[in-house]
Amino acid sequence: MIQERTILNVADNSGARYAMCIKVLGGSGRRYANIGDVIKVAIKEAVPRAKVKKGDVLKAVVVRTKKGVRRLDGSIIRFDNNACVLLNDTNAQPIGTRIFGPVTRELRNEKFMKIISLAPEVL
């Protein structure tokens, strides 16, 4: 579960290392975001000469959470960290060209096929 002020790892090669959630998108008063939800983030740490810089405000999709996701068969998939992939504000496509670490099949339902195709492992 991701809420405001949660620090997330950035799981792409856009140049950002860490991002902080500043708003959970999708309805007024919505408090938590899970895997596949779109959030608004502020970049907290970035590498030099990157596509994004510290202080940028962007949209991102949550790809991994410590809370995990429950499947219909009763299994739960949990991760060691909270991670997101930065999105372009205009067309909701990823800014980076590579995705680091595994992602879940639930992103396919949310119309993020580009992230699924770039990911090295889909659980």
Curated annotation (Swiss-Prot):
InterPro entries: Ribosomal_uL14, Ribosomal_uL14_bac-type, Ribosomal_uL14_CS, Ribosomal_uL14_sf. Signal peptide: none annotated. GO terms for cellular component: cytosolic large ribosomal subunit. It comes from the Bacteria. One of its GO terms (biological process) is translation. Keywords: Ribonucleoprotein, Ribosomal protein, RNA-binding, rRNA-binding. SUPFAM superfamilies: Ribosomal protein L14. GO terms for molecular function: large ribosomal subunit rRNA binding; structural constituent of ribosome. Pfam families: Ribosomal_L14 (PF00238). Belongs to the universal ribosomal protein uL14 family. Part of the 50S ribosomal subunit. Forms a cluster with proteins L3 and L19. In the 70S ribosome, L14 and L19 interact and together make contacts with the 16S rRNA in bridges B5 and B8. Binds to 23S rRNA. Forms part of two intersubunit bridges in the 70S ribosome. This is Large ribosomal subunit protein uL14.
